[in-house]
């Protein structure tokens, strides 16, 4: 309702994160294990979100050795919001409001270290090598054109034993048709959907109708959500999701 009202009036409430004082960091996180792929970035977001668990908490994330690209930041932010209802984060010396932040002014905040063991603990709670799978889903967040290209290249000359569902936006879908990505993906037996996301389209009913229980994805956000829709979700990198779809089990 508030978003609709803002669209109609051109105004938003002077409230929450629209106020500068509410955008300041409330907790610090020191990243001591550097994410290596999209799944790792999602796991990082999940770890931070679980430690926050509140709309009003704003994390300041420190010690990243690389600047994440848009897809990496997308997966991190999506997982952070899924696990912690966290709408805003700062990456020290990277994101606009944190480029000139002086760490010293936040020395009074709790500082939480994030280690490789934290990554492994979360990852191991979602499936194990050799587990049979019923469906592979790439969604939540919807795939960018870069991700579509990667799925297309990984799917080339493959034949999937289980259904593979890929969700993207209408614009990226149109671009992917023009660039030949959709053809490559669907030639392997996968299905590309546009303008939707898997968990928003009666995911429970789809699973029950098809007998799907074990779902594999590279999205830390979606495996968190779909546990509440009757699935037993598992997590793997995009590459291993594709290989698992070929084999019918987690590789």
Locate each region found by the language model.
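Non-transmembrane, aqueous-exposed alpha-helical and coiled segments at domain scale
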Residues: 1-251
């Amino acid at each position: 309702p508030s978003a609709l009202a803002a669209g109609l009036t051109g105004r938003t409430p002077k409230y929450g994160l629209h106020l500068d004082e509410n955008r300041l960091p409330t907790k610090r996180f020191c990243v001591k294990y550097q994410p290596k792929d999209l799944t790792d970035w999602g796991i990082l977001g999940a770890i931070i979100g679980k430690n926050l668990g509140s709309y009003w908490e704003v994390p300041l994330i420190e010690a990243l050795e690389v600047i994440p690209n848009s897809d990496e930041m997308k997966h991190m932010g999506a997982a952070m919001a899924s696990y912690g209802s966290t709408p805003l984060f700062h990456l020290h010396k990277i994101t606009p409001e944190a480029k000139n932040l002086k760490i010293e002014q936040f020395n009074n905040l709790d500082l939480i270290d994030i280690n490789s063991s934290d990554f492994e603990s979360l990852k191991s709670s979602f499936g194990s090598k050799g587990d049979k799978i019923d469906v592979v889903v790439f969604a939540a967040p919807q795939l960018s054109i870069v991700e579509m290209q990667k799925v297309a290249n990984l799917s080339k000359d493959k034949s999937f034993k289980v259904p593979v569902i890929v969700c993207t936006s209408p614009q990226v879908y149109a671009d992917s048709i023009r660039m030949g990505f959709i053809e490559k993906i669907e030639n392997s037996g996968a299905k590309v959907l546009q303008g939707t996301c898997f968990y928003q389209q009666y995911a429970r009913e789809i699973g029950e109708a098809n007998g799907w229980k074990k779902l594999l994805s590279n999205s830390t956000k979606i495996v968190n959500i779909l546990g509440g829709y009757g699935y037993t979700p598992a997590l793997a990198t995009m590459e291993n999701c594709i290989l698992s779809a070929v084999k019918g089990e987690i590789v």
